[in-house]
Structure formats: structure tokens, C-alpha cells
Amino acid sequence: LFSISSLRNKIIAVVGVLVFLGLLIQSGTNLWIGKRHALDELGQQTRALARSHSESIATWIAARQSVVRSFSSAADASDPVPMLAQAKIAGGVDTAYIGFPDKRIFFSDKQDLPAGYDPTARPWYQMAATTSGVALTAPYVDAASKKLVITFANAIKDGSSLKAVAGLDVFMDGIVSN
């Protein structure tokens, strides 16, 4: 019926096909497992990096909040400029200042403000005056430099009476470069 050589060829062909299918299945499984492992590893590294950046940002914000809270005694100083200059250095910020309800304002550095500048009309002042704790503004255009800036502002109170609002400005271009 079947010659040995023909049966032998059929067995070799069947075994060859089975070996090929086994290798194909094994390769596909290895590829799928490798891809899944690589994606899992990438996800873990991405989450770790995001967590690290989040912690760094939280630490950076907390440091500036601490600095803006720390110079509340500047509200009682006859010349608050030296305290403001020190706060600017300590906070690593672009400008430190303190605004009073009578519309006086003192800065760590000389500012080129528009005529009639009223700190009490500024969003940072109003936000801090109505917030317990340190207020952090959304980016806005700074009145003196015309650059985008964020402000950390803290109301300085005597009981329930507002004495002043202390602020720290950080220019957005500095934040972006870091």
C-alpha cells in the first residue's frame, strides 16, 4: 500500500509541521509575554517618575508657602524692605512684597509700577484676604514686568482685622526652565 519512503516522508512532513507550529506558538507566546512585561515595566517607571515629580513640586510649593508665612513681622516693621529682600533670597523667588489696606506697598526690589497702583485691587491681595492660609494664584500678567507670574500670598491679621498681605512672585519662565 504505502511505500516506506512515502510513509517516512509523510512522518517527516507531519513532524516538521508540528515542530514549526510549536516554534511559532512558543515565539508568539514569548513575544506576547515580553510585550506585556515591557508595558508593565514602562507603566511602573512612568508612575514612579510622576510620583517623584509630584513630590518635588509639593516640596517646592511648601517651601514658598513657609517663606511667605514667615515674614508676617514685616507688617509691623518701619522699613520692611530688608525683610522682603531676605524673603526673596530664602524663597528663591523673583519678588517679595507686602501690601497694606491703606494701599501702601513695599517690594524687595525697585519696581516700575503703573501710576495709581493699588495692591488692594489685585487678585492676589483679594484672594489672600479671603483665604485662610496661603493662597496660590493662577498665572497672570505681572503689573511691573509684564511677564506671566504666579503669586504665593498670605494675609497677615491682627485677630480678625487684616493688617497686610505678604506676597512672593515666581515668574513662569523660571518655573518652565526648571
Explain the meaning of each model-derived region.
Residues 2, 58, 165:
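Short, flexible active-site loop motifs that bind/organize anionic cofactors or intermediates
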